[in-house]
Design a protein with these regions (language model features):
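A short N-terminal helical cap/helix-turn-helix that marks the beginning
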Residues: 2-24
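Conserved pre-ATP/AMP-binding loop-to-beta segment of ANL
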Residues: 19-22, 135, 155-173
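Conserved AMP-binding/adenylate-forming core of the ANL superfamily
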Residues: 20, 24-69, 73, 77, ...
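Conserved AMP-binding A3 loop
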Residues: 35-39, 169-179
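Solvent-exposed alpha-helix faces
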Residues: 46-50, 103-106, 115, 179
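Structural core segment of the AMP-binding/adenylate-forming
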Residues: 81-150
Length: 179
């Protein structure tokens, strides 16, 4: 445990020591609960990292807006563990504010869930910086976004890159920076 220097080391340690133990348990709907193990977390976050690599987006800024969920968590880890900069944005902000923060952060990717489809549509129409829009939803409800699930399925393999612990990995906008 003394060799933990970054987020990836934490996930690797947990997968090695707790493997198939439950890391997350969450409701899918009123009657259905899903579970994810520490191995799932490692494999899924590495699939996100590989998806970024396949899009030539390693090290880029990635905005994420949506309710906290398992796809949100693996996206977060997949970005920071691939040397990128994650920009989590408050899902409850007005769409105009979210779009402004995405532009100010220099994000080249937007990952969103259906609750903020309005933001994805605006970014598609108005952003000059965002190159990819990725939906965290099980079912893709638009033609302009890529599916996170499909990207992960297509990019299942281990991922490793040297991480500079001194490099920026997260941009957090607080109420003081958002108005």
């Amino acid at each position: 445990m003394n060799n933990i220097k970054n987020m990836r080391d934490i996930i690797d340690f947990a997968a090695k020591n707790y493997g198939d133990n439950i890391a997350f348990k969450y409701k899918i709907n009123k009657n259905e609960v899903d579970e994810k193990s520490y191995n799932d977390l490692k494999n899924d976050s590495e699939a996100v990292s590989n998806a970024l690599k396949s899009l030539n987006m390693i090290g880029k800024h990635v905005a994420i807006v949506g309710q906290t969920s398992y796809p949100w968590i693996v996206s977060y880890f997949g970005v920071v563990n691939s040397g990128g900069v994650i920009v989590p944005i408050d899902v409850q902000l007005p769409a105009d504010d979210i779009c402004e923060l995405i532009e100010r952060s220099d994000a080249e990717i937007l990952i969103y869930d259906e609750i903020r489809h309005d933001v994805a549509e605006r970014i598609k129409e108005k952003s000059h910086n965002v190159k990819y829009i990725i939906s965290m939803n099980e079912k893709l409800n638009t033609e302009f976004a890529l599916s996170l699930n499909e990207l992960m399925a297509e990019n299942r393999s281990s991922f490793h890159i040297e991480i500079d612990e001194e490099k920026l990995c997260t941009i957090l906008f607080t109420s003081g920076t958002t108005g």
